[in-house]
Amino acid sequence: MVREGGSLPVRGGLLLTGLPFFFLGGPGYQSGRSFQGAWDLGHILFFALLGALLLGLINRRPAPPAYGRTFAFVFTAVFAAGLAVELLQMQSGGRTPDVTDLVRNQLGCLLAFAIFAPRDWRWTRLFRAGVAGLLVLALWPLSRSLIDETLAVRQFPVLADFETPFETRRWVHPSQLRTQTDIVRHGDRAARVQLTTARFSGVSLFHFPGDWRGYRSLRFSVYNPREEPMELNCRIHDVHHRDHGNAFQDRYNQQFQLQQGWNDLTVSLDRVRDAPRGRTMD
C-alpha cells in the first residue's frame, strides 16, 4: 500500500544517532533565536525518520494492512514515542513537557506519509500540499529569527528602534510591547510598554549583538505620559551573573526618575563593566 524508499538500516542508524540529542546539548539560556528555531525543527526530522522506518517495516509484511489502518497505527505510535521522550526529558532534566514539540513530532510523521504515500491514492497530491503548507508554518519561526538577527547586525550599534517588523521579539515578555506611531522620539515608530501590577513589571532586551568594545555609553529614550515622576530601574547583566546566583552585587543597577514627556538617558559602559563586585562584566 505504501511504497518503500531508502534503506531501513540507514533509517534506524540515523534514529539511534539522533536520539541522544533529546537529552544532551541543545539551546541554553543565552542561545540565539535561530539556533533555538533550528533545534526545534529536529523534532520534525527525527519523527519523520521514525515514521518512515515504521512504514518500511509494515511494507515488508507479506500482506500489509489497509492504508487507513497503517496511517492510524504509525500516527499513534509516533505520538506515543514523542510523549515518552517528553516524559523522559522531564525526569532526567527537569524539563516541562512541551505541547509544541508533540505537534512537531506529528508533523514529522505526516511528512513521512507525504513522501511515501502511494501514487495511486487519489488524495496524494492534496495531502502533500497540506503537509507542505504545515512545513512552511513550522519553518516560519526560524526564518523570522534569521531575518531579524541579520537586521540586528546591520543596525548595530542601534540595539532597537522598532522600525523593522520583528524587533519586539528581541525582548523578554514581548506581549507587553506594542509598536505605535503616535508618540515617537525619532523615525516613524516607538514601542509602548504595558506595565502590570506585578512587583517587577517591565521588559528586557535579550537578543542583540553582544560585543560592545569601543563604545562608551548606552543611550535610550523613555516617554512618561504621567504628570508625576516615575521610577525606572535599569539593570544590565551577563551570562556569568545568570549562572552564578543572580546576586544584586554582581550586575549593573541604576535608578532613573522619569519626568513627564521624553527622557533621554545615558549609561556609562565603563560603569557597567566595573559594576560586578570582584570581577569585570563580560
Would you name each region that the model predicts?
Residues 220, 264-282:
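Extracellular beta-strand ligand-recognition surfaces/modules
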Residues 221-227, 237-239, 270-272:
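Solvent-exposed strand-to-loop "edge" motifs in beta-rich extracellular domains
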Residues 1-100, 106-198, 206-210, 216-219, ...:
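Bulky hydrophobic segments
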Residues 204, 209, 277-279:
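Short histidine-centered beta-strand/loop micro-motifs
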Residues 210-211, 225:
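Short polar/acidic secondary-structure junctions
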Residues 199-201, 228, 242, 275:
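Residue-level signal for secondary-structure boundary sites
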